[in-house]
Amino acid sequence: MLSVIEKVNDVVNNFIWGVPAMICIIGVGLLLSFRTGFIQIRKFPYAMKVTLGRMLKKREASDGALTPFQAVCTALAATVGTGNVAGVAGAIAIGGPGAVFWMWISALLGMCTKFSEVTLAVHFHERNANGDLVGGPMYYIKNGLKKHWHWLAYLFSAFGVLTVFGTGNATQVNTITTAIDSALYNYDIISKESASTFNLIIGIVLAALIALILLGGIKRIGQVTEKLVPFMAVMYILLALGVVIINLKAIPGVFGAIIEGAFNPSAVTGGAVGSFFMSMKKGVSRGIFSNEAGLGTGSIAHACADTKKPVKQGFFGIFEVFVDTIVICTLTALVILCSGVSVGYGEAAGAELTISGFTSTYGGWVSIFTAVAMCCFAFSTIIGWGLYGTRCIEFLFGTKANKPFMVVYSLVAIVGATMNLGLMWSIAETFNGLMVIPNLIAVFLLSGVVVKLVKEYLAGEGAASTLKNSREEAKRTFL
Protein backbone atom coordinates (compact mmCIF):
# COMPACT_ATOMS: atom_id res chain seq x y z
CA MET A 1 0.00 0.00 0.00
CA LEU A 2 2.78 2.42 0.95
CA SER A 3 4.60 1.68 -2.31
CA VAL A 4 1.45 2.56 -4.30
CA ILE A 5 1.03 5.83 -2.38
CA GLU A 6 4.70 6.61 -3.00
CA LYS A 7 4.42 6.00 -6.75
CA VAL A 8 1.25 8.10 -7.09
CA ASN A 9 2.82 10.86 -5.04
CA ASP A 10 5.97 10.82 -7.20
CA VAL A 11 3.92 11.29 -10.36
CA VAL A 12 1.92 14.19 -8.91
CA ASN A 13 4.99 15.72 -7.27
CA ASN A 14 7.02 15.66 -10.50
CA PHE A 15 4.17 17.41 -12.31
CA ILE A 16 3.49 20.01 -9.61
CA TRP A 17 7.15 20.94 -9.18
CA GLY A 18 7.95 20.27 -12.85
CA VAL A 19 8.14 22.44 -15.95
CA PRO A 20 4.41 23.33 -16.34
CA ALA A 21 4.14 24.63 -12.77
CA MET A 22 7.35 26.63 -13.03
CA ILE A 23 6.22 28.15 -16.33
CA CYS A 24 2.94 29.21 -14.68
CA ILE A 25 4.68 30.73 -11.65
CA ILE A 26 7.26 32.55 -13.79
CA GLY A 27 4.53 33.57 -16.25
CA VAL A 28 2.33 35.13 -13.56
CA GLY A 29 5.42 36.85 -12.13
CA LEU A 30 6.20 38.33 -15.56
CA LEU A 31 2.59 39.42 -16.08
CA LEU A 32 2.47 41.18 -12.71
CA SER A 33 5.88 42.75 -13.32
CA PHE A 34 4.79 44.20 -16.67
CA ARG A 35 1.42 45.38 -15.34
CA THR A 36 3.01 47.16 -12.36
CA GLY A 37 5.87 48.58 -14.42
CA PHE A 38 8.40 46.24 -12.73
CA ILE A 39 7.69 47.85 -9.39
CA GLN A 40 10.15 45.51 -7.66
CA ILE A 41 13.00 47.18 -9.62
CA ARG A 42 11.60 50.65 -10.20
CA LYS A 43 10.67 51.18 -6.55
CA PHE A 44 13.26 48.95 -4.88
CA PRO A 45 15.01 51.82 -3.00
CA TYR A 46 11.59 53.04 -1.85
CA ALA A 47 10.63 49.50 -0.79
CA MET A 48 13.75 49.26 1.38
CA LYS A 49 12.99 52.71 2.83
CA VAL A 50 9.40 51.94 3.85
CA THR A 51 10.29 48.48 5.20
CA LEU A 52 13.66 48.89 6.91
CA GLY A 53 12.67 52.38 8.04
CA ARG A 54 9.44 51.16 9.65
CA MET A 55 11.20 48.31 11.43
CA LEU A 56 13.07 50.79 13.58
CA LYS A 57 9.87 52.48 14.73
CA LYS A 58 8.13 51.04 17.79
CA ARG A 59 4.35 50.91 17.57
CA GLU A 60 1.44 48.96 18.99
CA ALA A 61 -1.12 47.07 16.93
CA SER A 62 -4.82 46.93 17.69
CA ASP A 63 -6.35 43.88 19.40
CA GLY A 64 -6.17 40.74 17.27
CA ALA A 65 -3.58 42.23 14.92
CA LEU A 66 0.17 42.49 14.39
CA THR A 67 2.40 45.46 13.70
CA PRO A 68 3.75 45.50 10.11
CA PHE A 69 7.16 44.43 11.46
CA GLN A 70 5.67 41.50 13.41
CA ALA A 71 3.74 40.47 10.28
CA VAL A 72 6.87 40.33 8.09
CA CYS A 73 8.80 38.52 10.86
CA THR A 74 6.04 35.90 11.09
CA ALA A 75 6.09 35.46 7.30
CA LEU A 76 9.90 35.25 7.31
CA ALA A 77 9.70 32.78 10.21
CA ALA A 78 7.89 30.34 7.93
CA THR A 79 9.87 31.21 4.79
CA VAL A 80 13.45 31.29 6.09
CA GLY A 81 13.90 27.66 7.03
CA THR A 82 16.15 24.68 6.66
CA GLY A 83 15.61 24.87 2.90
CA ASN A 84 17.83 27.94 2.82
CA VAL A 85 20.64 25.71 4.07
CA ALA A 86 19.86 22.28 2.61
CA GLY A 87 17.89 23.30 -0.48
CA VAL A 88 20.55 25.58 -1.92
CA ALA A 89 23.19 22.88 -1.42
CA GLY A 90 20.98 20.41 -3.29
CA ALA A 91 20.40 22.85 -6.15
CA ILE A 92 24.15 23.43 -6.59
CA ALA A 93 24.98 19.71 -6.41
CA ILE A 94 22.43 18.72 -9.07
CA GLY A 95 22.29 21.92 -11.16
CA GLY A 96 25.84 23.21 -10.73
CA PRO A 97 26.88 26.76 -9.70
CA GLY A 98 24.70 28.14 -12.51
CA ALA A 99 21.60 27.16 -10.52
CA VAL A 100 22.34 30.16 -8.28
CA PHE A 101 21.90 32.53 -11.25
CA TRP A 102 18.48 31.09 -12.06
CA MET A 103 17.58 31.29 -8.38
CA TRP A 104 18.22 35.05 -8.60
CA ILE A 105 16.00 35.33 -11.70
CA SER A 106 13.14 33.52 -9.98
CA ALA A 107 13.56 35.81 -6.96
CA LEU A 108 13.44 38.91 -9.16
CA LEU A 109 10.04 37.90 -10.54
CA GLY A 110 8.97 36.41 -7.22
CA MET A 111 9.35 39.81 -5.55
CA CYS A 112 6.47 41.15 -7.66
CA THR A 113 4.35 38.03 -7.14
CA LYS A 114 4.71 38.21 -3.36
CA PHE A 115 4.18 41.99 -3.45
CA SER A 116 0.86 41.36 -5.21
CA GLU A 117 -0.15 38.55 -2.83
CA VAL A 118 0.53 40.68 0.25
CA THR A 119 -1.23 43.72 -1.22
CA LEU A 120 -4.34 41.66 -2.00
CA ALA A 121 -4.27 39.93 1.40
CA VAL A 122 -4.27 43.23 3.31
CA HIS A 123 -6.80 44.84 0.95
CA PHE A 124 -9.29 42.00 1.36
CA HIS A 125 -8.62 41.04 5.01
CA GLU A 126 -11.42 41.03 7.60
CA ARG A 127 -12.09 40.46 11.31
CA ASN A 128 -13.09 36.97 12.40
CA ALA A 129 -15.49 36.00 15.20
CA ASN A 130 -12.71 36.48 17.76
CA GLY A 131 -11.90 39.96 16.50
CA ASP A 132 -8.60 38.90 14.89
CA LEU A 133 -7.52 40.24 11.51
CA VAL A 134 -7.50 37.34 9.03
CA GLY A 135 -6.67 37.13 5.36
CA GLY A 136 -4.69 35.37 2.66
CA PRO A 137 -5.52 33.64 -0.63
CA MET A 138 -8.79 32.14 0.65
CA TYR A 139 -10.01 35.60 1.68
CA TYR A 140 -8.99 37.49 -1.44
CA ILE A 141 -10.71 34.76 -3.42
CA LYS A 142 -13.87 35.04 -1.28
CA ASN A 143 -13.94 38.84 -1.07
CA GLY A 144 -12.44 39.69 -4.46
CA LEU A 145 -13.93 37.20 -6.92
CA LYS A 146 -17.49 36.22 -7.75
CA LYS A 147 -19.18 33.29 -6.03
CA HIS A 148 -18.45 30.71 -8.73
CA TRP A 149 -14.74 31.05 -7.92
CA HIS A 150 -15.13 30.51 -4.17
CA TRP A 151 -14.40 26.77 -4.43
CA LEU A 152 -10.78 27.77 -5.01
CA ALA A 153 -10.67 29.24 -1.49
CA TYR A 154 -11.79 25.94 0.05
CA LEU A 155 -9.35 24.01 -2.14
CA PHE A 156 -6.45 26.22 -1.02
CA SER A 157 -7.43 25.84 2.64
CA ALA A 158 -7.77 22.06 2.39
CA PHE A 159 -4.34 21.72 0.78
CA GLY A 160 -2.97 24.09 3.42
CA VAL A 161 -4.20 21.94 6.31
CA LEU A 162 -2.76 18.80 4.71
CA THR A 163 0.58 20.54 4.17
CA VAL A 164 1.24 22.05 7.60
CA PHE A 165 1.63 18.81 9.54
CA GLY A 166 4.45 17.65 7.26
CA THR A 167 6.20 20.66 5.73
CA GLY A 168 5.54 22.97 8.64
CA ASN A 169 5.95 20.65 11.61
CA ALA A 170 7.11 17.02 11.59
CA THR A 171 9.94 17.42 9.07
CA GLN A 172 11.16 20.59 10.82
CA VAL A 173 11.20 18.87 14.23
CA ASN A 174 13.11 15.99 12.63
CA THR A 175 15.67 18.54 11.41
CA ILE A 176 16.02 19.94 14.94
CA THR A 177 16.67 16.53 16.49
CA THR A 178 19.13 15.61 13.73
CA ALA A 179 21.05 18.89 14.16
CA ILE A 180 21.22 18.53 17.95
CA ASP A 181 22.17 14.85 17.79
CA SER A 182 24.96 15.52 15.27
CA ALA A 183 26.44 18.31 17.39
CA LEU A 184 26.29 16.26 20.61
CA TYR A 185 27.80 13.16 18.97
CA ASN A 186 30.92 15.18 18.16
CA TYR A 187 31.46 15.86 21.86
CA ASP A 188 30.39 12.38 23.07
CA ILE A 189 27.59 13.92 25.15
CA ILE A 190 25.09 11.32 23.91
CA SER A 191 25.51 7.98 22.16
CA LYS A 192 23.59 6.73 19.14
CA GLU A 193 21.96 4.13 21.41
CA SER A 194 20.50 6.79 23.73
CA ALA A 195 19.49 9.14 20.89
CA SER A 196 15.93 7.79 20.54
CA THR A 197 15.07 8.53 24.18
CA PHE A 198 16.77 11.91 23.95
CA ASN A 199 14.80 12.74 20.78
CA LEU A 200 11.52 11.81 22.49
CA ILE A 201 12.32 14.30 25.27
CA ILE A 202 13.12 16.98 22.65
CA GLY A 203 9.80 16.24 20.93
CA ILE A 204 7.81 16.61 24.17
CA VAL A 205 9.57 19.89 25.03
CA LEU A 206 8.98 21.27 21.53
CA ALA A 207 5.30 20.22 21.62
CA ALA A 208 4.86 22.15 24.88
CA LEU A 209 6.60 25.25 23.48
CA ILE A 210 4.59 25.18 20.25
CA ALA A 211 1.31 24.88 22.18
CA LEU A 212 2.32 27.68 24.56
CA ILE A 213 3.03 30.06 21.66
CA LEU A 214 0.12 29.19 19.36
CA LEU A 215 -2.53 29.03 22.11
CA GLY A 216 -1.36 32.48 23.22
CA GLY A 217 -2.91 33.89 20.06
CA ILE A 218 -1.69 36.14 17.28
CA LYS A 219 -0.12 38.63 19.71
CA ARG A 220 2.15 36.01 21.27
CA ILE A 221 3.13 34.65 17.85
CA GLY A 222 4.15 38.16 16.79
CA GLN A 223 6.09 38.75 20.01
CA VAL A 224 8.09 35.54 19.51
CA THR A 225 8.83 35.95 15.80
CA GLU A 226 9.89 39.61 16.06
CA LYS A 227 12.67 38.50 18.43
CA LEU A 228 13.58 35.09 16.98
CA VAL A 229 13.75 35.98 13.27
CA PRO A 230 16.19 38.93 13.50
CA PHE A 231 18.40 36.91 15.89
CA MET A 232 18.62 33.83 13.69
CA ALA A 233 19.00 35.81 10.45
CA VAL A 234 21.78 38.04 11.81
CA MET A 235 23.61 35.06 13.36
CA TYR A 236 23.57 33.09 10.12
CA ILE A 237 24.44 36.09 7.93
CA LEU A 238 27.44 36.99 10.13
CA LEU A 239 28.73 33.39 10.11
CA ALA A 240 28.36 33.21 6.33
CA LEU A 241 29.93 36.63 5.75
CA GLY A 242 32.90 35.47 7.82
CA VAL A 243 33.45 32.56 5.41
CA VAL A 244 33.18 34.93 2.43
CA ILE A 245 35.66 37.44 3.90
CA ILE A 246 38.18 34.73 4.82
CA ASN A 247 37.96 33.35 1.27
CA LEU A 248 37.64 36.74 -0.44
CA LYS A 249 40.19 35.91 -3.16
CA ALA A 250 37.96 33.10 -4.40
CA ILE A 251 34.86 35.30 -4.86
CA PRO A 252 35.58 36.60 -8.42
CA GLY A 253 36.07 33.02 -9.60
CA VAL A 254 32.88 31.92 -7.84
CA PHE A 255 30.76 34.59 -9.54
CA GLY A 256 32.39 33.70 -12.85
CA ALA A 257 31.41 30.06 -12.32
CA ILE A 258 27.84 31.08 -11.44
CA ILE A 259 27.41 33.14 -14.63
CA GLU A 260 29.16 30.67 -16.94
CA GLY A 261 27.45 27.72 -15.28
CA ALA A 262 24.02 29.26 -15.89
CA PHE A 263 24.43 28.85 -19.66
CA ASN A 264 27.18 26.23 -19.98
CA PRO A 265 27.05 24.04 -16.85
CA SER A 266 29.22 21.24 -18.26
CA ALA A 267 32.19 23.63 -18.61
CA VAL A 268 32.07 24.41 -14.87
CA THR A 269 31.26 20.95 -13.50
CA GLY A 270 33.51 18.91 -15.75
CA GLY A 271 30.54 17.39 -17.56
CA ALA A 272 28.81 16.13 -14.38
CA VAL A 273 25.97 18.60 -15.00
CA GLY A 274 25.62 18.69 -18.77
CA SER A 275 22.15 20.17 -19.14
CA PHE A 276 21.43 23.88 -19.31
CA PHE A 277 17.81 23.01 -18.60
CA MET A 278 18.71 21.08 -15.42
CA SER A 279 20.66 24.05 -14.08
CA MET A 280 17.75 26.38 -14.79
CA LYS A 281 15.13 23.98 -13.38
CA LYS A 282 16.99 23.44 -10.10
CA GLY A 283 17.69 27.14 -9.61
CA VAL A 284 14.16 28.29 -10.39
CA SER A 285 12.46 25.56 -8.32
CA ARG A 286 14.80 26.20 -5.36
CA GLY A 287 14.06 29.92 -5.50
CA ILE A 288 10.31 29.34 -5.64
CA PHE A 289 10.35 26.74 -2.88
CA SER A 290 12.51 28.98 -0.68
CA ASN A 291 10.71 32.32 -0.90
CA GLU A 292 7.19 30.82 -1.39
CA ALA A 293 6.29 33.46 -3.99
CA GLY A 294 3.30 31.96 -5.80
CA LEU A 295 2.24 29.74 -2.90
CA GLY A 296 0.36 32.58 -1.19
CA THR A 297 1.20 31.35 2.30
CA GLY A 298 3.24 34.40 3.34
CA SER A 299 0.28 36.68 2.66
CA ILE A 300 -1.64 34.96 5.50
CA ALA A 301 0.80 36.45 8.02
CA HIS A 302 0.88 39.86 6.32
CA ALA A 303 -2.93 40.00 6.37
CA CYS A 304 -2.70 40.26 10.18
CA ALA A 305 -0.89 43.61 9.85
CA ASP A 306 -2.73 46.54 11.41
CA THR A 307 -2.51 48.91 8.44
CA LYS A 308 -4.87 50.68 6.07
CA LYS A 309 -2.29 50.84 3.27
CA PRO A 310 -2.18 47.50 1.42
CA VAL A 311 0.49 48.58 -1.06
CA LYS A 312 2.78 49.82 1.70
CA GLN A 313 2.57 46.41 3.37
CA GLY A 314 3.07 44.86 -0.08
CA PHE A 315 6.57 46.33 -0.17
CA PHE A 316 7.36 44.02 2.76
CA GLY A 317 6.74 41.16 0.29
CA ILE A 318 9.54 42.52 -1.90
CA PHE A 319 11.77 42.87 1.16
CA GLU A 320 10.93 39.32 2.29
CA VAL A 321 11.96 37.68 -1.01
CA PHE A 322 15.09 39.85 -1.12
CA VAL A 323 16.20 38.76 2.37
CA ASP A 324 15.27 35.11 1.90
CA THR A 325 16.71 34.45 -1.55
CA ILE A 326 19.04 37.25 -2.62
CA VAL A 327 20.72 37.55 0.80
CA ILE A 328 20.46 34.27 2.75
CA CYS A 329 20.33 31.76 -0.12
CA THR A 330 23.14 33.58 -1.95
CA LEU A 331 25.32 33.56 1.18
CA THR A 332 24.70 29.83 1.55
CA ALA A 333 25.82 29.33 -2.06
CA LEU A 334 28.96 31.41 -1.49
CA VAL A 335 29.82 29.43 1.66
CA ILE A 336 29.74 26.23 -0.39
CA LEU A 337 31.49 27.54 -3.50
CA CYS A 338 34.23 29.72 -2.01
CA SER A 339 35.24 27.53 0.93
CA GLY A 340 36.87 24.90 -1.26
CA VAL A 341 34.76 21.94 -0.11
CA SER A 342 34.34 19.14 -2.62
CA VAL A 343 30.95 19.24 -4.34
CA GLY A 344 29.86 15.93 -5.83
CA TYR A 345 28.16 17.39 -8.90
CA GLY A 346 25.35 15.24 -10.20
CA GLU A 347 24.78 13.65 -6.78
CA ALA A 348 22.15 14.58 -4.19
CA ALA A 349 23.34 16.74 -1.29
CA GLY A 350 21.82 18.60 1.64
CA ALA A 351 22.67 20.55 4.76
CA GLU A 352 25.84 18.52 5.33
CA LEU A 353 27.43 20.21 2.29
CA THR A 354 26.73 23.68 3.70
CA ILE A 355 27.95 22.67 7.16
CA SER A 356 31.16 21.36 5.54
CA GLY A 357 31.67 24.82 4.06
CA PHE A 358 31.52 26.34 7.54
CA THR A 359 33.67 23.73 9.29
CA SER A 360 36.36 23.77 6.58
CA THR A 361 36.77 27.50 7.23
CA TYR A 362 36.23 27.81 10.99
CA GLY A 363 36.97 24.32 12.28
CA GLY A 364 34.80 21.74 14.05
CA TRP A 365 33.74 24.04 16.88
CA VAL A 366 31.39 25.91 14.53
CA SER A 367 29.12 22.84 14.36
CA ILE A 368 27.50 24.03 17.61
CA PHE A 369 26.60 27.37 16.01
CA THR A 370 25.33 25.77 12.81
CA ALA A 371 23.19 23.43 14.93
CA VAL A 372 21.73 26.42 16.80
CA ALA A 373 21.05 28.20 13.49
CA MET A 374 19.35 25.11 12.03
CA CYS A 375 17.22 24.74 15.18
CA CYS A 376 16.16 28.40 15.05
CA PHE A 377 15.32 28.14 11.34
CA ALA A 378 13.26 24.99 11.89
CA PHE A 379 11.46 26.21 15.02
CA SER A 380 10.53 29.53 13.43
CA THR A 381 9.11 27.62 10.45
CA ILE A 382 6.97 25.53 12.82
CA ILE A 383 5.47 28.67 14.40
CA GLY A 384 4.86 30.43 11.09
CA TRP A 385 3.19 27.40 9.54
CA GLY A 386 1.19 26.91 12.72
CA LEU A 387 -0.45 30.27 12.02
CA TYR A 388 -1.06 29.32 8.38
CA GLY A 389 -2.69 26.04 9.38
CA THR A 390 -4.87 27.77 11.96
CA ARG A 391 -6.17 30.23 9.37
CA CYS A 392 -6.85 27.45 6.86
CA ILE A 393 -8.73 25.26 9.35
CA GLU A 394 -10.66 28.31 10.56
CA PHE A 395 -11.76 29.16 7.01
CA LEU A 396 -13.08 25.61 6.57
CA PHE A 397 -14.72 25.03 9.97
CA GLY A 398 -14.86 28.36 11.83
CA THR A 399 -12.97 29.69 14.85
CA LYS A 400 -14.23 26.82 17.07
CA ALA A 401 -11.76 24.52 15.28
CA ASN A 402 -8.70 26.67 16.07
CA LYS A 403 -7.74 25.37 19.51
CA PRO A 404 -8.25 21.65 18.75
CA PHE A 405 -6.10 22.13 15.65
CA MET A 406 -3.36 23.88 17.65
CA VAL A 407 -3.28 21.01 20.17
CA VAL A 408 -3.04 18.35 17.45
CA TYR A 409 -0.44 20.40 15.56
CA SER A 410 1.67 20.66 18.72
CA LEU A 411 1.50 16.91 19.40
CA VAL A 412 2.72 16.13 15.87
CA ALA A 413 6.11 17.44 17.04
CA ILE A 414 6.54 14.23 19.05
CA VAL A 415 5.97 12.16 15.89
CA GLY A 416 8.49 14.27 13.99
CA ALA A 417 11.12 13.78 16.68
CA THR A 418 10.89 9.99 16.80
CA MET A 419 10.01 8.69 13.31
CA ASN A 420 11.52 8.36 9.83
CA LEU A 421 9.66 10.91 7.71
CA GLY A 422 10.88 10.32 4.15
CA LEU A 423 7.46 9.67 2.60
CA MET A 424 5.69 12.28 4.76
CA TRP A 425 8.12 14.94 3.54
CA SER A 426 7.47 14.02 -0.08
CA ILE A 427 3.67 14.01 0.34
CA ALA A 428 3.72 17.32 2.22
CA GLU A 429 5.85 18.83 -0.54
CA THR A 430 3.24 17.71 -3.08
CA PHE A 431 0.34 19.32 -1.17
CA ASN A 432 2.50 22.41 -0.75
CA GLY A 433 2.78 22.60 -4.53
CA LEU A 434 -0.95 22.02 -4.98
CA MET A 435 -1.57 25.23 -3.01
CA VAL A 436 0.00 27.11 -5.93
CA ILE A 437 -2.85 26.32 -8.34
CA PRO A 438 -5.81 28.11 -6.66
CA ASN A 439 -3.57 30.95 -5.50
CA LEU A 440 -2.09 31.72 -8.94
CA ILE A 441 -5.52 31.63 -10.57
CA ALA A 442 -6.76 34.18 -8.02
CA VAL A 443 -3.71 36.45 -8.31
CA PHE A 444 -3.99 36.37 -12.11
CA LEU A 445 -7.70 37.28 -12.04
CA LEU A 446 -7.13 40.03 -9.45
CA SER A 447 -4.04 41.51 -11.10
CA GLY A 448 -6.14 44.49 -12.18
CA VAL A 449 -6.94 45.26 -8.53
CA VAL A 450 -3.21 45.24 -7.74
CA VAL A 451 -2.52 47.67 -10.60
CA LYS A 452 -5.33 49.98 -9.43
CA LEU A 453 -4.13 49.97 -5.81
CA VAL A 454 -0.53 50.66 -6.90
CA LYS A 455 -1.61 53.62 -9.03
CA GLU A 456 -3.71 55.01 -6.17
CA TYR A 457 -0.89 54.60 -3.68
CA LEU A 458 1.84 56.10 -5.84
CA ALA A 459 -0.40 58.97 -6.96
CA GLY A 460 -1.21 59.86 -3.35
CA GLU A 461 2.21 58.85 -1.98
CA GLY A 462 0.71 56.51 0.52
CA ALA A 463 -2.90 57.67 0.66
CA ALA A 464 -5.15 54.87 1.93
CA SER A 465 -7.34 53.24 -0.69
CA THR A 466 -11.12 53.28 -0.39
CA LEU A 467 -11.75 49.69 0.64
CA LYS A 468 -15.47 49.41 -0.04
CA ASN A 469 -15.47 50.94 -3.53
CA SER A 470 -12.44 48.93 -4.65
CA ARG A 471 -13.98 45.66 -3.46
CA GLU A 472 -17.24 46.27 -5.26
CA GLU A 473 -15.41 47.29 -8.43
CA ALA A 474 -13.29 44.14 -8.24
CA LYS A 475 -16.37 41.91 -8.07
CA ARG A 476 -18.02 43.74 -11.02
CA THR A 477 -14.90 43.69 -13.19
CA PHE A 478 -13.13 40.40 -12.55
CA LEU A 479 -15.35 37.52 -13.59
List the predicted regions and their residue ranges.
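N-terminal alpha-helical transmembrane segments of multi-pass membrane transport
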Residues: 1-82, 92-99, 110, 245, ...
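Flexible loop linkers connecting adjacent transmembrane helices
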Residues: 38-66, 90-100, 104, 112-147, ...
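Membrane-interface loop-to-helix entry segments
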Residues: 24-31, 35-48, 173-180, 197-247, ...
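Transmembrane helix-loop junctions in multi-pass membrane proteins
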Residues: 4-5, 35-40, 83-88, 166-176, ...
